[in-house]
């Protein structure tokens, strides 16, 4: 799509007007979905590793850019779900979630997660 150009010999306007007529870069919005971690915290919701894989596949097919899969140290089932999702070869970035404790971070690395949201509470009770 081309924009009309101002003929500066006929019309004088400020630079902001000229910039408004220039083609603008296309803006994109990325989606970070937390259903597999945060969604499972709702009362009565328990998802099997296979169900989490199906949800991750559906999110990927829907074009979600980043899927937060959870904390591998929360349970063996969560760790297994993360492994299944990583092995599925999805286009979306797969992100873990972890406390800032060394063992928790090492569990992310051991599974092969390349990115994570790291919770860093300031309360001694939560550390």
Question: Predicted regions span which residues?
Answer:
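N-terminal amphipathic alpha-helix/helix-capping segment at the start of soluble metabolic enzymes
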Residues: 1-46
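Short, well-ordered coil/turn segments that N-cap beta-strands
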Residues: 25-29, 63-65, 90-94, 112-114
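Active-site mouth loops of central-metabolism enzymes
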Residues: 31-51, 94-101, 127
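Non-cysteine beta-strand/loop elements that form the S-adenosyl-L-methionine
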Residues: 32-33, 114-124
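Conserved, mostly hydrophobic/aromatic
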Residues: 39, 59, 116
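Short, acidic/polar
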Residues: 48-58, 102-107
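Glycine-rich, proline-tolerant flexible connector loops at the mouths of alpha/beta enzymes
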Residues: 64-90, 120-127
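Acidic (Asp/Glu)-rich catalytic clusters
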Residues: 83-89, 105-117
């Amino acid at each position: 799509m081309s924009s009309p150009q101002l003929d500066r010999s006929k019309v004088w306007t400020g630079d902001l007007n000229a910039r408004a007529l220039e083609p603008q870069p296309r803006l994109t919005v990325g989606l970070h979905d937390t259903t597999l971690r945060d969604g499972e915290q709702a009362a009565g919701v328990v998802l099997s590793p296979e169900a989490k894989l199906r949800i991750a596949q559906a999110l990927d097919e829907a074009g979600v850019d980043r899927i937060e899969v959870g904390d591998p140290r929360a349970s063996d089932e969560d760790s297994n779900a993360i492994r299944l999702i990583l092995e599925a070869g999805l286009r979306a970035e797969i992100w873990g979630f972890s406390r800032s404790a060394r063992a928790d971070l090492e569990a992310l690395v051991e599974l092969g997660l390349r990115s994570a949201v790291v919770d860093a509470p300031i309360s001694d009770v939560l550390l």
